[in-house]
């Protein structure tokens, strides 16, 4: 009889826990938009070395 309240509380805790679908993000879960944006920005940086050198002298 003493185990019944403990069993009910455990059932309530298990039912309120998040589902299996909630998975933490890994380093490989990078959105594709950021990769495409980087691919677009790289040629622009290479085509304008003067602007780059004004901001950062190490890129010249």
UniProtKB/Swiss-Prot annotation:
Asked if the Swiss-Prot or TrEMBL record annotates the protein with the keyword Disulfide bond, the reply is yes
Spell out the family assignment given in the record's similarity comment. Answer: Belongs to the conotoxin T superfamily.
- InterPro entries reported in the protein's UniProt record: T-conotoxin
PTMs per UniProt: Contains 2 disulfide bonds that can be either 'C1-C3, C2-C4' or 'C1-C4, C2-C3', since these disulfide connectivities have been observed for conotoxins with cysteine framework V (for examples, see AC P0DQQ7 and AC P81755).
Keyword Signal tagged:
yes
Keywords for this protein: Cleavage on pair of basic residues, Disulfide bond, Secreted, Signal, Toxin
Kindly provide the name given to this protein in its UniProt entry.
Conotoxin VnMRCL-012
Which organism is this entry from? Answer: Conus ventricosus (Mediterranean cone)
Gene Ontology terms: cellular component? extracellular region
What does the record say about tissue specificity?
Expressed by the venom duct.
Q: Which residues belong to the signal peptide in this entry?
A: 1-22
**Prodomain residues:** 23-50
Recorded GO terms, molecular function? Answer: toxin activity
- Domain of life according to the entry: Eukaryota
Question: What the record says about its domains?
Answer: The cysteine framework is V (CC-CC).
Tell where it localizes.
Secreted
């Amino acid at each position: 009889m003493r185990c019944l309240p403990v069993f009910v509380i455990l059932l309530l805790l298990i039912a309120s826990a998040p589902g299996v679908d909630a998975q933490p993000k890994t380093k490989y879960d990078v959105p594709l938009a950021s990769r495409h944006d980087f691919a677009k920005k790289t040629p622009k940086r290479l085509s304008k070395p003067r602007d780059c050198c004004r901001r950062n002298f190490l890129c010249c």
